[in-house]
Amino acid sequence: LLESKSFVFNVAFINFSGVQLLLDVFSQLENKNIKGKILTSTYLNFTQIKALEKLKEFSNIELRIYDCNHTNIGFHAKSYIFEFENFYEVIVGSSNITASAFKTNIEWNVKTTLKKEDEFLKNILNEFDNLWKDSFEVNEEFLRNYEFFVNQQKEQTFIYKQKIKTNFMQKNALEKLEILRQKDQTKALIIAATGSGKTYLSAFDVK
């Protein structure tokens, strides 16, 4: 990376732990005025705001984001492209910019060296250019809107079945409790196995 003329990162996810591992290198690249483009995405809302904010601090890096919520298309690419004097090196595989991807995960990545006139390289760069044009600049407005959206998602709890129904034990117990109340009884003791639903039974009874 430090010996390259320019670089392009095209990854689905970026988190702060991954950016931290690259800070020293990015600082050296900035000092050497080696420019780069980084494209990431909102796919699964996994890319972290803090990571994007940190990357924006580097004057030599252009940062854009592909908004999957806008296009309704998943973005799962992982490629790293390095330009040298007479050739390119391209790494394509499974690694996002995360600490776990760089250090601990089982990841499969393939590096290939390509001449600048190589047709395969031209296809890769053209595809990246198309994605770049379809993405958004990571500016303050985007960051605030994305942060608001992500926070909203965190506040929502996913429940597969919205309506909770009584099981056999609970239904039977509720019927017997009702019989006791009809007889003006004010006390009852319920004994049931662990995990059978006593807490929910209490809630159903209160309801």
Residue ranges and their predicted role:
Residues 174, 178-179, 206-207:
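Generic structural signal for well-ordered alpha-helical scaffold segments
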Residues 135, 181-184:
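A general structural signal marking secondary-structure boundaries and capping sites
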Residues 183-205:
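Walker A/P-loop
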Residues 1-175:
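PLD/PLD-like phosphodiesterase catalytic module centered on the HKD motif
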